[in-house]
Amino acid sequence: MTPIYLQRGALHSALGADLRAAAAALQGGQRPLPGSFLLHELQQPRPYLAVSDSGESRQQRCDRLLGETLGEQPGELDDCLLILASTSLDIDDLERLIAAQGGFRPEHSTPLDLLAEDLRQRWGFADAFTLNTACTSAANGLLYGARMLAAGLYQRVLVLACETPSAIAQQGFGALDLTSPSCAYRPFHPERDGLILGEAYAATLLAREPGEAPLAKLLGGFSACDTSNLTTTREDGSHIDWVMREALRSAGVDAGQIGLVKLHGTATGANDRAESNGVRLLFGDALPPLCVLKPWLGHTLGACGLSETLLLVKSLDKLPGVDYADEALLPLSAEPTCVAADSLLLANFFGFGGNNASLVLQRCTGENA
């Protein structure tokens, strides 16, 4: 795969108002305090990590995010593709409309590309695509953007990922018994009891050239669907192992060169078992350092492929440990982890429905930009 640069990036999350603040909070081990929603089926509260209320609409947040990523004077964008990656898209708008009008009507339906097309028209992007592949949406956005750049179809690609609070996600994941009743987000803990959903908005500008101060290089990656089950992936880890191997092959590296694995780590039963087995199939006993980020961001669903990627590359000098390392299914660290700035990184994103993706990344330093 042709290496592609993440020239700039922006993040708004429960962990911080911007990427710098989120990285500082992560390195300081500061977890955001979750709010809650009522799980109707059980009439019980469940935690939720929301972005601080700024009074902005989703459109205003996305515009601000694009401004942070493109700069104050972005110029013409007729050489730039927009890829919008999200699970929720505009479902929260639809939910409010249904509530206001007393039920759903056929005319309430909107096209899948409504948000992306609105941004394309207002900002002047060359084209706009929408990716909706569950928790791999943004990771797939990075991969598709990289392929289009390598093919010379566009000069730049702006990947925008957003995940807003919605009843269908909250109630749906809750009904599947996937949300944590204890509010303890513990990926790979033997007594883990589910995930904490999170809100996030993230963006990055991709290009073949590094630009002035690039964040990272996307060296390779792979995405595929495990069709053995309608909702999950094979718990023996075989499909995850294959996806990671193909990602490494596309980058021209082997498992022994990986300096850190960013695990998907949802803290759900089946997903953590599958990932744990897959990681052990790939690395055997020679596991590199491992980290999880969802306890600090929440599971940002369609946005996690970008929100976690940006946070990862900004925090390599101090990634927090977990307080249950001795019990974990994989050898997580109890102490903060520091890896070399130019380490090769493997980042995993495994989606509901069996769509699995892995990225091979390297943070840009003065020497390797």
Positions of predicted regions on the chain:
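Short beta-strand-to-loop elements that line the ligand-binding cleft
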Residues: 130-132
